[in-house]
């Protein structure tokens, strides 16, 4: 499943572990619940691993944040790394589509990421959960998930456009998400891979790029959205005091109003809380005026709060709610599917 978390999120994982690739792991039937997030997160210093140290590690693997260098070989959905002297190969495990530039195929690269086990029979593979990649000797970009908790300043990022609205878009590289804002919007589409260069600042409780330079790169990606987190009334109440980026769904009564300056607001009243959903600057035609006053189900990205009351939503779909959907939209303890990109923090025993 596509991850619905960012690095630095705190989560509670419940499940039965088993051994795979020489390491213990949780199965895809595990329950994961978000319990908070770090206000400032950085990866540890990457340990440089040459062929000798990797050979030793492969005999007795442990999770380790490392820097690995070698020749990248891309074949379909496989991203293997040939390392001279290694009794096997490196393998980038399930990177987000579009993040590894196909132009790097056949070139020497540097990779930062977590070593997460050894698989294979005739050929052994050291599996890497990649956080960044560049041509050998180049400059590693800071992962978006880290930028999202870093101090405001001048920053660069590359990632996939995963959603857009009239004033910008969300970008992701698999480690996290950030809003790229411009009051005039950008000529990009979902699935475009872009480079972003500009200033970041804290707004609506989350870090975002403000009117940066955006360059479309010569590749695109197929975007698959995560399983949406079903928000309860309690989730709304807590979100407006501690916002986070996530793909969400919720049900409530839509109110469309226009003020004397011509600004239109799309707010959704939620039973059981004074907090509300707010569809932020939807693209033309996405929200039908016929839905005004009706109970609707909204799905999209939560990306901050306004006035301590509104959960800002970059909408992907909206529809009149069926009675069955209205009943389940506020159930407690909705399960979020596990993923391969979150840094787990286990709570309890």
Residue ranges, per PLM feature:
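OB-fold single-stranded nucleic acid-binding module
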Residues: 1-349
């Amino acid at each position: 499943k596509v991850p619905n978390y960012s690095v630095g999120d705190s989560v509670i994982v419940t499940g039965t572990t088993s051994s795979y690739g020489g390491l213990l792991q949780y199965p895809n039937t595990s329950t994961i619940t978000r319990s908070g997030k770090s206000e400032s997160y950085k990866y540890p210093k990457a340990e440089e691993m040459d062929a000798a140290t990797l050979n030793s590690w492969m005999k007795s693997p442990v999770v380790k944040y490392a820097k690995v260098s070698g020749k990248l070989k891309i074949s379909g959905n496989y991203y293997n790394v040939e390392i001279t002297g290694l009794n096997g190969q490196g393998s980038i495990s399930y990177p987000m589509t579009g993040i590894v530039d196909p132009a790097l195929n056949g070139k020497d690269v540097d990779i930062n990421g977590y070593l997460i086990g050894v698989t294979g029979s005739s050929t052994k593979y050291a599996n890497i959960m990649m956080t960044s990649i560049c041509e050998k000797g180049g400059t590693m970009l800071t992962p978006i998930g880290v930028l999202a908790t870093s101090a405001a300043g001048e920053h660069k990022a590359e990632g996939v456009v995963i959603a857009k609205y009239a004033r910008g878009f969300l970008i992701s590289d698999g480690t996290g998400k950030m809003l790229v804002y411009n009051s005039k919007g950008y000529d990009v589409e979902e699935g475009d891979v872009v480079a972003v260069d500009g200033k970041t600042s804290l707004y609506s409780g989350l870090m975002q790029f403000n009117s940066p330079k955006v360059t479309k790169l010569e590749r695109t990606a197929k975007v698959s959205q995560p399983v949406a987190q079903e928000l309860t009334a309690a989730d709304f109440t807590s979100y407006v005091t501690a916002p986070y980026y996530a793909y969400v769904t919720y049900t409530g009564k839509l109110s469309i109003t226009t003020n004397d300056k011509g600004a239109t607001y799309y707010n959704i009243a939620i039973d059981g809380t004074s907090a509300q959903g707010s569809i932020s600057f939807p693209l033309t035609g996405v929200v039908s005026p016929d839905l005004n006053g009706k109970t609707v189900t909204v799905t999209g990205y939560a990306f901050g709060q306004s006035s301590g009351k509104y959960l800002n939503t970059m909408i992907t779909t909206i529809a009149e709610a069926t009675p069955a959907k209205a009943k389940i939209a506020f159930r407690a303890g909705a399960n979020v599917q596990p993923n391969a990109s979150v840094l787990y923090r286990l709570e309890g025993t």
